[in-house]
């Protein structure tokens, strides 16, 4: 989808309070280090180096924001959060960043949707499930949520079907999709879903569309 291809760097922040206030829908990408988060963002936006992928997983420790929409008319923002759970960083750094991400996911007012990336060969980890539990109140209040099973090309079709079934049970509802940057599996579908989330049909508009045509229109 062309809308995703308009993505451009907006800002980066090491602390939550350094992030600017955003008045458009914000979609956060989160996941365990090495789940393919940066690759996913770069594939969706068709930009090889938009999201930085460190050669040492767990070393990217900033929240990066990317604007979407025409220049001067941003209509959504992507947030790339640091990967979590990798042993290469110190315990104190891991705990600090887990707290920063938790605060972001629970309190960020402009947050409209969360995309949780997961390696289907590993399934949802304890940290993934802890994240799900932390944001569940917001999801129940209307926050959109997608579990994206990356690296789908590593699985057979039967294995993909099994992974989808198991993850849907673990996630307790919500969207679950397979994704492969290599095979471009799920790319268009995910891009379309994110666009819909960033451009919700207002109830008033939906009601007008649902009305039968008037006699003057017949």
From Swiss-Prot:
<dbReference type="Pfam" id="PF01926">
    <property type="entry name" value="MMR_HSR1"/>
</dbReference>
<dbReference type="GO" id="GO:0000917">
    <property type="term" value="P:division septum assembly"/>
</dbReference>
<dbReference type="GO" id="GO:0005829">
    <property type="term" value="C:cytosol"/>
</dbReference>
<dbReference type="InterPro" id="IPR019987">
    <property type="entry name" value="GTP-bd_ribosome_bio_YsxC"/>
</dbReference>
<keyword id="KW-0717">Septation</keyword>
<dbReference type="InterPro" id="IPR027417">
    <property type="entry name" value="P-loop_NTPase"/>
</dbReference>
<feature type="binding site">
    <location>
        <begin position="80"/>
        <end position="83"/>
    </location>
    <ligand>
        <name>GTP</name>
    </ligand>
</feature>
<comment type="function">
    <text>Necessary for normal cell division and for the maintenance of normal septation.</text>
</comment>
<feature type="binding site">
    <location>
        <begin position="31"/>
        <end position="38"/>
    </location>
    <ligand>
        <name>GTP</name>
    </ligand>
</feature>
<keyword id="KW-0132">Cell division</keyword>
<keyword id="KW-0479">Metal-binding</keyword>
<feature type="binding site">
    <location>
        <position position="60"/>
    </location>
    <ligand>
        <name>Mg(2+)</name>
    </ligand>
</feature>
<feature type="binding site">
    <location>
        <begin position="179"/>
        <end position="181"/>
    </location>
    <ligand>
        <name>GTP</name>
    </ligand>
</feature>
<keyword id="KW-0131">Cell cycle</keyword>
<comment type="similarity">
    <text>Belongs to the TRAFAC class TrmE-Era-EngA-EngB-Septin-like GTPase superfamily. EngB GTPase family.</text>
</comment>
<dbReference type="InterPro" id="IPR030393">
    <property type="entry name" value="G_ENGB_dom"/>
</dbReference>
<feature type="binding site">
    <location>
        <begin position="150"/>
        <end position="153"/>
    </location>
    <ligand>
        <name>GTP</name>
    </ligand>
</feature>
<dbReference type="GO" id="GO:0046872">
    <property type="term" value="F:metal ion binding"/>
</dbReference>
<keyword id="KW-0342">GTP-binding</keyword>
<keyword id="KW-0547">Nucleotide-binding</keyword>
<feature type="domain" description="EngB-type G">
    <location>
        <begin position="23"/>
        <end position="200"/>
    </location>
</feature>
<feature type="binding site">
    <location>
        <position position="38"/>
    </location>
    <ligand>
        <name>Mg(2+)</name>
    </ligand>
</feature>
<feature type="binding site">
    <location>
        <begin position="58"/>
        <end position="62"/>
    </location>
    <ligand>
        <name>GTP</name>
    </ligand>
</feature>
<dbReference type="GO" id="GO:0005525">
    <property type="term" value="F:GTP binding"/>
</dbReference>
<protein>
    <recommendedName>
        <fullName>Probable GTP-binding protein EngB</fullName>
    </recommendedName>
</protein>
<keyword id="KW-0460">Magnesium</keyword>
<dbReference type="InterPro" id="IPR006073">
    <property type="entry name" value="GTP-bd"/>
</dbReference>
């Amino acid at each position: 989808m062309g809308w995703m291809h308009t993505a451009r760097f907006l800002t980066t922040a090491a602390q939550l309070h350094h992030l600017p206030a955003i008045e458009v829908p914000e979609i956060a990408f989160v996941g365990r280090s090495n789940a393919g988060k940066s690759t996913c963002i770069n594939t969706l936006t068709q930009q090889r180096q938009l999201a930085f992928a460190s050669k040492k997983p767990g070393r990217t420790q900033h929240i990066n924001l990317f604007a979407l929409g025409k220049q001067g008319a941003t209509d959504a923002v992507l947030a790339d959060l640091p990967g979590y759970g990798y042993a290469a960083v110190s315990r104190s750094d891991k705990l600090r960043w887990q707290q920063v991400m938790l605060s972001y996911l629970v309190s960020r007012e402009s947050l409209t949707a969360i995309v949780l990336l997961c390696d289907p060969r590993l399934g949802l980890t304890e940290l993934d499930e802890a994240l799900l539990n932390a944001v569940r109140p917001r999801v129940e209040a209307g926050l959109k949520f997608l579990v994206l099973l990356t690296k789908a090309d590593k699985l057979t079709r039967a294995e993909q079907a099994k992974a989808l079934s198991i993850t849907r049970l673990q996630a307790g509802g919500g969207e679950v999709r397979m994704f492969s940057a290599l095979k471009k599996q799920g790319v268009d579908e995910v891009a379309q879903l994110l666009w819909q989330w960033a451009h919700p049909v207002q109830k008033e508009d939906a009601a007008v569309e649902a009305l039968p045509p008037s006699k003057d229109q017949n």
